[in-house]
Every structure is written in structure tokens, then in C-alpha cells.
């Protein structure tokens, strides 16, 4: 079982947990290169902007956190394995109950169509995972997250490990020392996600 105080302390030190997909053993990650999303320069793609204008999705915050984390942990077409073990899921469900972990959800005709979840600490948001069941749902959730963070004065959106999808969303890689500097500044501020 992951102790909540240890988990929060780890994030403050630039670490985050992942589970081995084969045996579900939890280990701590601290990549040398960190993916972050520069909040001030973020712009949605033309396709996402079009979807936003059409208002296809109802966006909610924390109305079904468990549904989002389960959606993120579910096997994907491209990869049947997940790093979100039951132990990690339980820890984040507790963090949600404590008001530290949050979900941004896209609903379409009353069904959860996609979303993302992460942790809010100070002026930093640590994006953990996203999923979709309907095209563009996770990207719309991401757009709403970025706008919420900008509106509230957040300084850091940590996307953890770069991948092609994050790169399309505007993430860039920074080295560990720069990340820790940005993290330290962000943790020194008090901002409420909700």
C-alpha cells in the first residue's frame, strides 16, 4: 500500500509512481528529461478548436474521478498493459477524497467519453493520465485543464514523460535541474484547483 504522506512527499521531490505492468510492483520515477506544457504558449489544434466551438462535450470536474482513473487504467488498442495498478488507483482515489487529485471529464449525452486526472499542489498540476472513448474527448478535457490552470495562475503543468501525443498537445522537455527549479517556485504558491 502506498502511504499518502510518502506519495505527496515524493511529488515535492520530483518523483512519481508507476507500476510494472507484469507484476504490479510500484516503483518511483524521476526522469532526467521531464515533459511539461508551457501554459502561456498553449494553443488548441484547429480540430479541437472546432469541437470546442460546436460544444459537443459537457465538461465536468471531479464528478466521476473513479470512472476517469478506471478509463485511464483500461487496456488500449495500441497497448494492453497499464502502469496504473490497483494500489496506485486506491492511492489516487484517496487523494481525490482529500481534494488533492482531480479529474477533468468530457461527457456526451450523459456518458463519460474521456478525461484526465492529476494532482494539484501549490501552483503545480501533475498530469497523470488521460483516456477517450469518443474522438477528441481527452483533448477537450486537456484544453479545459490548461484554461483552468491559466485562469487560476498555475505555473507548472507537469506531463511527466514525453510521448508523441503530449508533443502534439504542446509539451516540451526540460532537464531535471530546470524542472526542480520550476517545481520549487510552483510549490511555494497557494492556489486552489476548485
Curated annotation (Swiss-Prot):
Residues in coiled coil: none
Protein location: Cytoplasm
UniProt main location, coarse: cytoplasm
Enzyme class: transferase
Any one cellular-component term (Gene Ontology): cytoplasm
Molecular function as annotated in GO: leucyl-tRNA--protein transferase activity
GO biological process: protein catabolic process
Keyword vocabulary terms for this entry: Acyltransferase, Cytoplasm, Transferase
Catalysed reactions listed for this entry: N-terminal L-lysyl-[protein] + L-leucyl-tRNA(Leu) = N-terminal L-leucyl-L-lysyl-[protein] + tRNA(Leu) + H(+); N-terminal L-arginyl-[protein] + L-leucyl-tRNA(Leu) = N-terminal L-leucyl-L-arginyl-[protein] + tRNA(Leu) + H(+); L-phenylalanyl-tRNA(Phe) + an N-terminal L-alpha-aminoacyl-[protein] = an N-terminal L-phenylalanyl-L-alpha-aminoacyl-[protein] + tRNA(Phe)
Signal peptide residues on this chain, from the entry's feature table: none
EC number: 2.3.2.6
Family: Belongs to the L/F-transferase family.
Purpose: Functions in the N-end rule pathway of protein degradation where it conjugates Leu, Phe and, less efficiently, Met from aminoacyl-tRNAs to the N-termini of proteins containing an N-terminal arginine or lysine.
Entries under HAMAP family matching the protein: Leu_Phe_trans
Protein name: Leucyl/phenylalanyl-tRNA--protein transferase
Gene that this polypeptide is encoded by: aat
Amino acid at each position: 500500500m502506498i502511504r499518502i504522506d510518502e506519495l505527496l512527499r515524493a511529488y515535492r521531490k520530483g518523483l512519481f509512481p508507476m507500476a510494472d505492468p507484469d507484476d504490479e510492483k510500484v516503483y518511483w520515477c524521476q526522469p532526467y528529461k521531464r515533459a511539461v506544457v508551457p501554459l502561456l504558449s498553449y494553443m488548441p489544434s484547429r480540430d479541437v478548436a472546432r469541437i470546442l466551438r460546436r460544444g459537443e462535450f459537457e465538461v465536468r470536474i471531479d464528478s466521476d474521478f473513479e470512472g476517469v482513473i478506471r478509463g485511464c487504467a483500461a487496456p488500449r488498442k495500441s497497448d494492453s498493459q497499464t502502469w496504473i495498478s490497483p494500489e496506485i488507483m486506491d492511492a489516487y482515489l484517496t487523494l481525490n477524497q482529500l481534494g488533492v487529485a482531480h479529474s477533468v471529464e468530457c461527457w456526451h449525452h450523459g456518458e463519460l467519453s474521456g478525461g484526465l486526472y492529476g494532482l494539484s499542489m501549490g501552483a503545480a498540476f501533475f498530469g497523470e493520465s488521460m483516456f477517450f472513448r469518443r474522438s477528441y474527448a481527452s483533448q477537450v478535457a486537456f484544453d479545459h485543464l490548461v484554461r483552468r490552470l491559466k485562469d487560476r495562475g498555475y505555473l507548472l503543468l507537469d506531463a511527466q514523460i514525453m510521448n508523441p501525443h503530449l508533443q502534439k498537445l504542446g509539451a516540451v522537455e526540460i532537464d531535471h535541474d530546470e524542472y526542480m527549479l520550476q517545481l520549487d517556485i510552483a510549490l511555494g504558491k497557494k492556489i486552489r484547483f476548485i
